[in-house]
A protein has these predicted regions:
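Extended ligand-binding clefts on enzyme/binding-domain cores
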Residues: 151-152, 162-274, 281-292, 304-338, ...
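Bacterial Sec-dependent N-terminal signal peptides
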Residues: 1-23
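CBM-like carbohydrate-recognition segments
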Residues: 11, 22-64, 73-86, 92, ...
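Asp-box/WD-like beta-propeller blade repeats and closely related beta-sheet repeat scaffolds
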Residues: 128-161
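Surface loop/turn signatures of beta-propeller and other carbohydrate-active proteins
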Residues: 34-38, 145-146, 204, 208-209, ...
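Helix-capping and short linker residues that terminate individual alpha-solenoid repeat units
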Residues: 44, 78, 94-99, 124, ...
Length: 376
């Protein structure tokens, strides 16, 4: 009995020592404010169009991901300016999907609806919910469930279904969400985009073998797998545990998280190519932030072992908050938009990605969960 007590005390001491590497809550908030203030100062008008190789509206998916992060941050740093910035963004886009296309089926163009729903929950004005509800209702009424053909789509649209189901107390959204998830997992590209051998996801059917990385391994893109991990966390935190597919989502979440653990670099980042560290290997913020978000949420909610995952999230957060985050609030090492490891290269600390918003959204999501993990 004395030996058992000693072992338990030692284990507890080890956890306490590890926990000390998580920064204080106040430090996390300062880091998140720094990054967010940099962006809000650069983009004071939330509906100013985004110009890169062409002009795009300000509620495309990249900006939608930013607002996902901002809404999460708002819950721990309750500044009215965050809320006002978000409401103005929604209002001036008339609470509609991208380009006002109420009946778009493209997940990227639906993503902004996630924040519209969050803002409706704060102030339930009907116009905040009407268009995104009409959009998803049309998807359901069509009977088609093969829209998600790339894994990014899981994050872009899947949480909208669960949020609508919870908000409206209507399980039809949960049921159709599973049909769409089941298609991409088991059927898309022939046998689905999830590889049960490695518990990782191919980005789309173009990357299913015989496609391979230069070292002969399967191509698993970090940010793509990060989208899946984040989406599953977002779904699990809202979906009733009584749902018929809750345990499958949880199992997929846990398997993916465990598969990622041994792939983390010693510096805390993950490479853009998860199974070929020499194929554009190096520090990358967005995928790392999504993994930190998912894993930390898993720890905070008892779905992942603190003993196993705390060292990974501690290393990951310290990497992106100390190396990626610059003194002026700029986030370095963000891979530009694309669909595979070679896109947006080179990834460096001072390179401005084609869009600065989605990387920040991922960072805010991760930091919000780290804040909850921190003791004081």
């Amino acid at each position: 009995m004395k030996k058992l007590i000693l072992v338990l005390l030692l284990a507890y001491s080890m956890l306490e020592a590890l926990a000390q590497n998580i920064p204080a809550k106040s430090t996390v908030v300062e880091q998140l404010r720094s990054a967010n203030d940099y962006f809000m100062k650069k983009w004071p008008d939330p509906v100013k169009t985004i110009i890169t190789n062409k002009e795009r509206p300000a509620n495309i998916w990249t900006r939608g991901v930013y607002y996902e992060g901002l809404m999460a941050f708002y819950k721990i740093d309750n500044q009215k300016r965050y809320y006002d910035y978000s409401v103005e963004w929604g209002e001036k886009h008339h609470w509609k999907p991208v380009r006002g296309e109420v009946y778009t089926r493209h997940a990227d163009n639906q993503n902004c609806g996630m924040t519209y729903i969050d803002l409706y929950r704060i102030d339930p004005k009907p116009e905040r919910l009407a268009a995104i509800k009409a959009n998803i209702d049309a998807v359901i009424n069509s009977g088609r469930y093969n829209d998600w053909t790339w894994i990014d789509a899981i994050q872009m649209a899947m949480p909208i279904f669960v949020k609508l189901g919870v908000t409206l107390n209507d399980t039809k959204y949960f049921d159709y969400m599973y049909k769409m998830y089941s298609h991409i997992k088991y059927q898309e590209g022939g046998h689905g985009l999830f590889n049960p051998k490695d518990n990782l996801w191919w980005r789309d059917k173009d990357f299913i073998p015989p496609y391979a990385e230069p070292n002969g391994e399967d191509c698993y893109w970090a940010r793509g797998n990060g989208w899946v991990l984040a989406a599953l966390a977002l779904v699990l935190q809202e979906l009733p545990k009584t749902d018929a597919h809750y345990m499958e989502y949880l199992d997929d979440f846990q398997k993916l998280a465990k598969a990622l653990l041994p792939l983390q670099r010693t510096d805390g980042f993950w490479n853009v190519s998860l199974h070929d560290p020499n194929h554009f290997g190096g520090k990358e913020t967005s995928g790392t932030a999504l993994f930190v978000y998912g894993m930390t949420w898993g720890i905070n909610n008892g779905h992942l072992s603190k003993t196993d995952f705390l060292p990974a999230v501690e290393k990951g957060w310290n990497a992106i908050s100390k190396e990626s985050l610059q003194p002026n609030g700029f986030l370095g090492y963000v891979q530009s938009t694309g669909k595979e490891p070679k896109d947006g290269q080179p990834v460096t600390v001072d390179k401005v990605p084609d869009f600065e918003d989605y990387g920040l959204g991922c960072f805010l999501l991760a930091g919000t969960e780290i804040y909850k993990l921190a003791k004081k």
